[in-house]
Swiss-Prot record:
Binding positions for GTP per the UniProt entry: 16-21, 133-136
Cell compartments where the protein resides: Cell inner membrane
GO molecular function: GTP binding; GTPase activity; guanosine tetraphosphate binding; ribosome binding; translation elongation factor activity
HAMAP family: LepA
Function according to Swiss-Prot or TrEMBL: Required for accurate and efficient protein synthesis under certain stress conditions. May act as a fidelity factor of the translation reaction, by catalyzing a one-codon backward translocation of tRNAs on improperly translocated ribosomes. Back-translocation proceeds from a post-translocation (POST) complex to a pre-translocation (PRE) complex, thus giving elongation factor G a second chance to translocate the tRNAs correctly. Binds to ribosomes in a GTP-dependent manner.
Catalytic activity: GTP + H2O = GDP + phosphate + H(+)
Membrane topology: Peripheral membrane protein
Name of the protein described by the UniProt record: Elongation factor 4
Length: 598
């Protein structure tokens, strides 16, 4: 296949704008799978992806398309996720392509996510081709949306292809546009091999499978390859393409996208964004990779029974083979025993990882409240980064705490603007800009990341009836009055319930939490005092009353001193119980933390 007949592209779209369905149609049209093997969302290979209807991992397909000009073109299509937590997956997929289809729902118009990914594509000098999907819907307004694309994104969209992935209208026009408008790849077949690792995942039988884009040179089966960052040499056992099924071709040439299996045992052996070259004729310099992804949210995960700790560790190691962005380190808590502190990209990522651990590895887990990373300057002038409330230094040795601030871009229809602004102000946000585009308003806020990761996304969706969309990225650290809220049960601090919160909200948060715990902790044979403290100051308290037996029921009349003696005896017994008894915290108590302030 010559260079000029290859097209590499990916699809950018907001969640639910019909990206996966469109890719299904393209595969069907080019005969990539027989009718029998066709299933909805072919490229979403995880069960969770199908159930939640979202795409998490990037996947690729190679299709052959016979165009109207009689030539046969090879289309390499890399699927991308649309959710804000997975935007790094998108930037990787885009780096392997020359063009992108910007798919917009003709009923809903442009959304913030689409915009963010679209700018990523434009920064990479890619050709962006607008496509209006779902034109079969009664509420579709293709002309208005075409204007909106021009107004907000700034691409000419008058002659954008109009199609309906569900009914199959206009699919051929989409393929023609890909062939006509997206440029062919550049790259010299005779130069030394340079291949970019776009994604890697772990296969139980073959080891690491890497999705690669050959930038220059060619790669054949049985070649000795070298990973440039580590310098380790492997042998390429299998080389081929996905038609969505993995098909061995034995060779990949410059400009093509395919997979390579080289018997690598662990994922860090083929890090994403790395360059592969030949051992016998290595390239002189590596390709510019991707920026490392930093976890934004940290939470502790603990197995409910401590016997599962080993299995939990193995499960995490296996998951991190597939998810390069997962970060974890062992942690122990006096309340919950041994577990791990895990870093996530956002709340959706956290939910999905927890669900995969419970579903695929059959574990029962407790999650502590998620926290973000704070920058703490101590009185000695040292700077620490704290992601765990229990690691915060004592109050008297802290000079100042800086909290992470994100820049949030929100696109919202005009009628919901007021409620969105109120929400942002409640979350301690500062508005930096506001522009009107037709019926939509684009607002930019600087918000504390701690507020965004807790429940901001859900609240934004509910105040705007699901129409507002959000994209955010970390901006800088800013001084803030933060303090640690501790929960004491019978005078003992429970490390797993601690949280870092803003001074203004600390008291109300403490009160809410104490009330919640009071409802959740079962009554015992002795009084349980639940307190919320900031430093040494108690801000809220509640008591769970003891259960007591009626010890004087057996006395009929008689002397009062007899009753006193029995009551005193009961009191002493309760006191003794209290000094040795400990309170079992139910799983719901930890979940209550996540829901505080709702």
């Amino acid at each position: 296949m010559q260079h000029k007949h290859i097209r590499n592209f990916s699809i950018i779209a907001h969640i639910d704008h019909g990206k996966s369905t469109l890719s299904d149609r393209l595969i069907q049209h080019c005969g990539g799978l027989s009718e029998r093997e066709m299933s909805a969302q072919v490229l979403d290979s995880m069960d969770i992806e199908r159930e939640r209807g979202i795409t998490i991992k990037a996947q690729s397909v190679t299709l052959n398309y016979k165009a109207r000009d009689g030539e046969t073109y090879q289309l390499n299509f890399i699927d991308t996720p649309g959710h804000v937590d997975f935007s790094y997956e998108v930037s990787r997929s885009l780096a392997a392509c020359e063009g992108a289809l910007l798919v917009v729902d003709a009923g809903q118009g442009v959304e913030a996510q689409t915009l963010a990914n679209c700018y990523t594509a434009i920064d990479l000098n890619m050709e962006v081709v607008p496509i209006l999907n779902k034109i079969d819907l009664p509420q579709a307004e293709p002309d208005r949306v075409a204007e909106e694309i021009e107004d907000i994104v700034g691409i000419d969209a008058i002659d954008a292809v109009r199609c309906s992935a569900k009914t199959g209208i206009g699919i051929e026009d989409v393929l023609e546009v890909i062939v006509r408008q997206i440029p062919p790849p550049e790259g010299d077949i005779d130069a030394p091999l340079k291949a970019l690792i776009v994604d890697s995942w772990f296969d139980n039988y073959q080891g690491v499978v890497s999705l690669v884009r050959i930038v220059q040179g060619e790669l054949r089966k049985n070649d000795k390859i070298k990973i440039m960052s580590t310098g380790v040499v492997h042998q390429a056992d299998k080389v081929g393409i996905f038609t969505p099924k993995a098909t061995d071709t034995g060779i990949l040439r410059a400009g093509e996208v395919g997979f390579i299996v080289a018997g690598i045992k662990e994922i860090h052996g083929a890090p994403v964004g790395d360059t592969i070259t030949l051992a016998r004729a290595p390239a002189d310099a590596a390709l510019p990779g991707f920026k490392k992804v930093k976890p934004q949210v940290y939470a502790g995960l603990f197995p409910i029974s401590s016997d599962d700790y080993e299995d939990f560790r193995d499960a995490l190691a296996k998951l991190s083979l597939n998810d390069a962005s997962l970060f974890f380190e062992p942690e122990s808590s006096s309340a919950l025993g041994f577990g791990f502190r895990i870093g996530f990209l956002g709340m959706l990522h956290m939910e999905i990882i927890q669900e995969r651990l419970e579903r695929e590895y059959d574990l029962d887990l407790i999650t502590t409240a998620p926290t973000v990373v704070y920058e703490v300057v101590t009185t000695d002038g040292e700077t620490l980064y704290v992601d765990n409330p229990s690691k915060l230094p004592p109050v008297n040795s802290i000079d100042e705490i800086h909290e992470p601030i994100v820049e949030a871009h929100i696109l919202v229809p005009q009628e919901y603007l007021g409620s969105v602004i109120t929400l942002c102000v409640d979350k301690r946000g500062v508005q930096t800009s506001m522009t009107y585009h037709g019926k939509q308003v684009a607002v930019t806020y600087e918000l504390p990341m701690a507020e965004v990761v807790m429940d901001f996304f859900d609240k934004l969706k509910s105040t705007s009836r699901g129409f507002a969309s959000l994209d955010y990225n970390f901006k800088h650290f800013q001084t803030a009055e933060m303090s640690r809220l501790d929960i004491l049960i019978n005078g003992e601090r429970v490390d797993a319930l601690a949280m870092i919160t803003h001074k203004d909200n600390a008291q109300s948060r403490g009160r809410d939490l104490v009330e919640k715990l009071r409802e959740l902790i079962p009554r015992q044979m002795f009084d349980i005092a639940i307190q919320a403290a900031i430093g040494n100051q108690i801000v809220a308290r509640s008591t769970i009353k003891q259960l007591r037996k009626n010890v004087i029921a057996k006395c009929y009349g008689g002397d009062v001193s007899r009753k006193k003696k029995l009551l005193q005896k009961q009191k002493d017994g309760k006191k003794r119980m209290k000094s040795v008894g400990n309170v079992e915290l139910p799983q719901e108590a930890f979940l209550a933390l996540l829901k505080v302030g709702k």
